[in-house]
C-alpha cells in the first residue's frame, strides 16, 4: 500500500455520529500511550496528522483519517489508563466494544502492543474480544527499537502465545521505520 494522501476527517464520541460512507475501515487499538497516534503519523509520513502526547489518555474520541480517498484509518482511545474516572472508562468501553463488534465497514483491527510490556492482561483481553467478535486482526509490536535482541524474541513469543488468530505480527519502530513497509503490505490486503 502506498499512501499518497492522508487527511483528518472527523472525531466522534457517539455511534450515531460515525461516517455514513461505507469505505473500508482499518482500526488501530491498544493501551494508552502504546503509540497509536505516533504509528499513524509514521505510516502516513505526516508528523502532525494524529495528535500525540506523552500524557496517557490524550485520545478520547474515535478519530477518522481518510487515506488515499479510498479507506479510513481509525484511531481509537487507549484502554487501561488508570487515571480516567470510572464513569468515563465505562462509557469508552461501551462505545468501543459496540463499535468494534457491530461496524460492518471494519475490515481489519490492528492491535498495538508495547514490545517492552508484551504480556499485559488488557492486551490478552483485547485479543480475546477480537477473536470472539470474529474480527480479523493483526498485531504490531511498538517501540521495538528499545529492546535488546533477546528481549525482542521473548516479546514476539509472548504475543504469539495469546494472539492465536492474528493475521500477522509486525515489529515496528516509528524512529527507524523498521516494519513500516511490511505493515503497509499487510494493510493493503484489507483496503480493497
Swiss-Prot record:
Where on the tree of life does the source sit, at the highest rank? Answer: Bacteria
State the function annotated in the UniProt record.
Necessary for normal cell division and for the maintenance of normal septation.
The protein's matches in PROSITE patterns, at most eight in alphabetical order, are given as: G_ENGB
Entry GO terms, CC: cytosol
Q: Does the keyword Oxidoreductase apply?
A: no
Which keywords label this protein? Cell cycle, Cell division, GTP-binding, Magnesium, Metal-binding, Nucleotide-binding, Septation
Chain's gene name: engB
Q: Which residues bind Mg(2+)?
A: 37, 59
EngB-type G domain mapped to chain residues = 22-192
The record ties this protein, via NCBIfam families, to: GTPase_YsxC (TIGR03598)
The cofactor(s) it depends on are: Mg(2+)
Q: Name one Pfam family in it.
A: MMR_HSR1
GO terms, molecular function: GTP binding; metal ion binding
| Binding, GTP | 30-37, 57-61, 75-78, 142-145, 172-174
Q: HAMAP family attached here?
A: GTPase_EngB
Q: What is this protein called?
A: Probable GTP-binding protein EngB
Biological process terms from the Gene Ontology for this record are:
division septum assembly
Q: What does the sequence similarity comment in the record state about its family?
A: Belongs to the TRAFAC class TrmE-Era-EngA-EngB-Septin-like GTPase superfamily. EngB GTPase family.
Amino acid at each position: 500500500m502506498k499512501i499518497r494522501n492522508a487527511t483528518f476527517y472527523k472525531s466522534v464520541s457517539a455511534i450515531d455520529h460515525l461516517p455514513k460512507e461505507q469505505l473500508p475501515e482499518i482500526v488501530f487499538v491498544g493501551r494508552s500511550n502504546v503509540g497509536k497516534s505516533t504509528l499513524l503519523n509514521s505510516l502516513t509520513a505526516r508528523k502532525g496528522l494524529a495528535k500525540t502526547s506523552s500524557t496517557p489518555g490524550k485520545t478520547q474520541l474515535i478519530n477518522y483519517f481518510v487515506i488515499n480517498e479510498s479507506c479510513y484509518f481509525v484511531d481509537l482511545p487507549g484502554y487501561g489508563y488508570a487515571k480516567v474516572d470510572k464513569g468515563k472508562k465505562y462509557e469508552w468501553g461501551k462505545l468501543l466494544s459496540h463499535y468494534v463488534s457491530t461496524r460492518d465497514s471494519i475490515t481489519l483491527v490492528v492491535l498495538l502492543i508495547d514490545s517492552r510490556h508484551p504480556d499485559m492482561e488488557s492486551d490478552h483481553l483485547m485479543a480475546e474480544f477480537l477473536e470472539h467478535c470474529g474480527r480479523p486482526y493483526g498485531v504490531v509490536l511498538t517501540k521495538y527499537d528499545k529492546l535488546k535482541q533477546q528481549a525482542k524474541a521473548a516479546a514476539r513469543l509472548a504475543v504469539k502465545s495469546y494472539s492465536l488468530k492474528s493475521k500477522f505480527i509486525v515489529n515496528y519502530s516509528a524512529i527507524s521505520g523498521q516494519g513500516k513497509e511490511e505493515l503497509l503490505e499487510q494493510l493493503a490486503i484489507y483496503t480493497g
